[in-house]
């Protein structure tokens, strides 16, 4: 699809509490854990159990589609409540404590349907409209999620929720749809944007990675174009070494394999599903809090790569 001829003023997120956090809170001293969830309770569990971020999707049976505005709003509240509880437990000077100060990252997938990642003009416009509406929602909710603690009165307090977007779009020939991705990043207007595993379907991942850096994408979710992150470790390692957007390893990532994955790739961020076992095929795949806690414990103990 060619670059779309669409202009619109996106609401600014930069001066509100639901934004990308200031650099002081952006780089934890541990491997970052991002969960993948498809409901509000999954966001709440992830924040309560100590995960750093959650990707919020609908319809994970189709690899994730855009959740409703109502679901996103409720998820922001759920995450903010957990962060405020953590900060309240840390006391009035919580802003001086890294674990308490860190916002919870909520990444909303923007994907109008399952299937291929090649979109026509109508689908592209729908994706841009979704980013615009969610950005507007963030502004509306900013006052409701403003930090309550004083943090000692020094400097700007971190937000409770670091809201961002997960996008992905390809052309028919397996390259990044630069026109559409640029419009989506522009509409996010400063909020962090992740390019999802459509990346693994690119004909040339090195070229695609360079394109995404030029488009302002901050994170790339990838298995190294393999079935699992472990199988794609060499590709992931090459991307990490090139120093572009932050690489988030995904694809059958499990707590017991984190040490080997980090050592073989150099990644500092991982993405994993933590589903509860289902009794029937039709039962929704809820998030398993015990599994999230095991994953959190694992990422806190794995040494950071040099």
Please report, for each region that a protein language model flagged, where it lies by residue.
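C-terminal alpha-helical cap/extension of soluble enzyme domains
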Residues: 13, 111-115, 143-144, 153-157, ...
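Glycine/small-residue-rich loop that forms an oxyanion/phosphate-binding "nest" at active or ligand-binding sites
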Residues: 68-86, 93-179
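Glycine-enriched alpha-helix->loop->beta-strand junction motifs that scaffold or abut catalytic
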Residues: 47-54, 79, 102, 159-162, ...
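Catalytic cores of alpha/beta
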Residues: 38-45, 116-136, 203-215, 239-243, ...
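Hydrophobic faces of well-ordered beta-strands that scaffold small-molecule active sites
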Residues: 31-35, 54-56, 106-110, 165-167, ...
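Surface-exposed amphipathic alpha-helices with a cationic face
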Residues: 22-25, 73-84, 95-100, 135, ...
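Active-site-adjacent beta->alpha loops and helix N-cap segments on the catalytic face
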Residues: 40-41, 60-82, 122, 171-187, ...
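N-terminal amphipathic alpha-helix/helix-capping segment at the start of soluble metabolic enzymes
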Residues: 2-36, 93-99
């Amino acid at each position: 699809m060619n670059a779309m001829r669409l202009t619109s003023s996106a609401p600014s997120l930069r001066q509100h509490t639901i934004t990308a956090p200031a650099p002081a809170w952006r780089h934890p001293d541990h491997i970052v854990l991002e969960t993948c969830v498809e409901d509000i309770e999954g966001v709440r569990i992830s924040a309560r159990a100590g995960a750093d971020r959650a990707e919020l999707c609908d319809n994970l049976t189709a690899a994730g589609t855009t959740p409703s505005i109502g679901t996103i709003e409720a998820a922001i509240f759920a995450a903010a409540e957990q962060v405020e509880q953590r900060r309240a437990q840390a006391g009035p000077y919580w802003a001086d404590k890294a674990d308490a100060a860190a916002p919870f990252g909520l990444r909303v997938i923007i994907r109008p349907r399952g299937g291929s990642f090649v979109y026509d003009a109508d689908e592209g416009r729908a994706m841009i409209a979704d980013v615009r509406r969610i950005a507007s929602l963030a502004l509306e909710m900013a006052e409701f999620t403003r930090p309550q603690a004083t943090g000692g009165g020094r400097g700007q307090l971190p937000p409770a929720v670091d809201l961002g977007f997960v996008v992905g779009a390809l052309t028919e020939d397996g390259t990044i749809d630069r026109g559409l991705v640029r419009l989506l990043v522009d509409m996010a207007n400063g909020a962090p944007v992740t390019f999802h595993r459509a990346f693994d379907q690119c004909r040339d991942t090195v070229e695609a990675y360079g394109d995404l850096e030029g488009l302002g994408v901050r994170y790339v979710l990838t298995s190294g174009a393999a079935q699992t992150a472990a199988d794609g470790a060499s590709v992931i390692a090459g991307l990490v070494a090139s120093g572009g957007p932050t690489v988030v390893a995904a694809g059958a990532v499990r707590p017991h394999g984190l040490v080997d994955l980090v050592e073989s790739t150099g990644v500092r961020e991982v993405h994993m599903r933590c589903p509860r076992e289902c009794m029937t095929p039709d039962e929704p795949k809820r998030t398993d809090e015990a599994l999230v806690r095991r994953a959190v414990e694992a990422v806190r103990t794995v040494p950071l790569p040099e």
